[in-house]
Amino acid sequence: SKRKAPQESLNEGITDFLVELANYERNVNRAIHKYNAYRKAASVIAKYPQKIKSGTEAKKLDGVGAKIAEKIDEFLTTGKLRKLEKIRNDDTSSSINFLTRVTGIGPAAARKFFDEGVRNLEDLKKIEHKLNHHQQIGLKYFEEFEKRIPRSEMQKMEALILKELDIVDPEYIGTICGSYRRGAESSGDIDILLTHPDFTSQSEKQPKLLHAVVDHLESIGFITDTLSKGDTKFMGVCQLQKEKEEEEEESLHRRIDIRLIPKDQYYCGVLYFTGSDIFNKNMRTHALEKGFTLNEYTIRPLGVTGVAGEPLLVDSEKDIFEYIQWKYREPKDRSE
């Protein structure tokens, strides 16, 4: 997601600057390893129960190295960071960072538009004819997509989606994943995982199982735009309709993704797309220690030679935890 949930923590100043540096490394320098390093440090520090007093103290945490510790010292003594000031005052990086906030514009496209003289929303509107369909929609709803979705609205959308799924075919199973499932107070977008007993990894592709749902949600006015529609993944825009005519406020347009997953791979998918990223990494590492390889599709035992065997049967998230002998964790406890 383009926007991360706000972190409430004692070390917010530190985590904020680390996330900002991370995004700069990813979007402007295309340095994904540096992005990951900053994100990891931010995540560890966000969970640290005390207010950090020095870089040395921070360096004791796993994921905080010497360079990041130095930056923390500078931030704690001066209240700011020379590197960040420089980045913020640098037109290139601030423009590129801004352009990547438009859905459909990744770092490469942002760099290309920047080289063509595009700096802001007004400039983008002038070259709208050069944008692809996805980017045009990203531009059209830019202000709305920037706003986070309150949990109360997510709950309304979840209830509507599950009710309508049941109308299309009661055999569908749907789960809203992402930070919402972990209990977050707000979300950046809606991420739905969908499955049906007729669709397994052994069966033929079943695009109609996905398209029937999308078409139905379009017909009731919930899905308003399509960004892309493949056999197993739909990306688009949705909007809650007014419950009563007299409601003044229209709901905002929101980004929605619907993924159709084979039934036998569904719970590995739900686990993966619930996150968090850090939790997933830790769980995969633990699985490897126990002799299993875990990804968003399957969990498979590793042979002595390190070759993965056949996927194990999974009928719930709990099954996956049991295979790797890990105590089950409720979604709300999966932030790390």
From Swiss-Prot:
Cofactor note: Binds 2 magnesium ions per subunit.
Keyword Metal-binding: yes
Annotated active site: 71
Enzyme Commission (EC) number: 2.7.7.7, 4.2.99.-, 4.2.99.18
Name of the encoding gene: polb
Protein function: Repair polymerase that plays a key role in base-excision repair. During this process, the damaged base is excised by specific DNA glycosylases, the DNA backbone is nicked at the abasic site by an apurinic/apyrimidic (AP) endonuclease, and POLB removes 5'-deoxyribose-phosphate from the preincised AP site acting as a 5'-deoxyribose-phosphate lyase (5'-dRP lyase); through its DNA polymerase activity, it adds one nucleotide to the 3' end of the arising single-nucleotide gap.
CDD domains linked: NT_POLXc
Binding residue positions for K(+) 1: 59, 61, 64
Binding-site positions, Mg(2+) 1: 189, 191
GO molecular function, a single term: DNA-directed DNA polymerase activity
Residues the record lists as binding K(+) 2: 100, 102, 105
Modified residues (Omega-N-methylarginine): 82, 151
Annotated stretches, region: DNA-binding: 182-191
Superkingdom of the organism of origin: Eukaryota
Gene3D superfamilies membership: 5' to 3' exonuclease, C-terminal subdomain, Beta Polymerase, domain 2, DNA polymerase beta, N-terminal domain-like, DNA polymerase, thumb domain
Entry protein name: DNA polymerase beta
Binding site for Na(+) 1: 59, 61, 64
One GO biological process term: double-strand break repair via nonhomologous end joining
Residues noted as binding Mg(2+) 2 in the record, renumbered to the chain: 189, 191, 257
Family the UniProt entry places it in: Belongs to the DNA polymerase type-X family.
Gene Ontology CC terms: cytoplasm; nucleus
PROSITE patterns associated with the record: DNA_POLYMERASE_X (PS00522)
Keywords associated with the record: Cytoplasm, DNA damage, DNA repair, DNA replication, DNA synthesis, DNA-binding, DNA-directed DNA polymerase, Lyase, Magnesium, Metal-binding, Methylation, Nucleotidyltransferase, Nucleus, Potassium, Sodium, Transferase, Ubl conjugation
Catalytic activity reported: DNA(n) + a 2'-deoxyribonucleoside 5'-triphosphate = DNA(n+1) + diphosphate; a 5'-end 2'-deoxyribose-2'-deoxyribonucleotide-DNA = (2E,4S)-4-hydroxypenten-2-al-5-phosphate + a 5'-end 5'-phospho-2'-deoxyribonucleoside-DNA + H(+); 2'-deoxyribonucleotide-(2'-deoxyribose 5'-phosphate)-2'-deoxyribonucleotide-DNA = a 3'-end 2'-deoxyribonucleotide-(2,3-dehydro-2,3-deoxyribose 5'-phosphate)-DNA + a 5'-end 5'-phospho-2'-deoxyribonucleoside-DNA + H(+)
Cofactor needs: Mg(2+)
Annotated residues for binding of a 2'-deoxyribonucleoside 5'-triphosphate: 148, 179, 182, 188-189
